[in-house]
Amino acid sequence: MKLPYSKESDIVIKEANRVARKLGQNFVGSEHLIVALASVADTTAYSILNENGLDIVKIIDALKYTLEPGGVVTGERDKYTMSARRILEDSQYEARRLNSQEVGTEHILLALIKETDCVAVKLM
C-alpha cells in the first residue's frame, strides 16, 4: 500500500513539473526534482540543501546548457524519466523505513541522493 505524499511533497512534485516545462522539456527528471526540492521553501529538504550550501542558481544554469528542449512523451507515466520514477518509488521505501505516515520532502531527497547515477546527483 502506498503512503500518501505530504502537502509539501505534492508541491515539490508540481514544482518539478513546472521547472521542466519552463526549461522546455516534456519530461520530469531527477534534475527537475532537485531544483524543486531546493526551491520550495519551508520544507525539510529545502533546509537540508540550503544548510549544505547547494547553489540552485548554478544548477539551473548548468541545466540550461546541458539539456535539450523537447523529448517525446506518450502518456502520463512516460512523463517521468526512469530515474525520477525510481526516486519517487524509493521515497515510499524511505518513508516506511523511517516509520513515517506520509512521504515527506526529506524522503524524496534521501531517495534522490541514493540514485547515484542520476543527473541531479552529478549536478550537485
Q: Where are the language model's segments positioned?
A:
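Histone-fold recognition with a strong bias for associated Lys/Arg-rich disordered tails
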Residues: 1-124
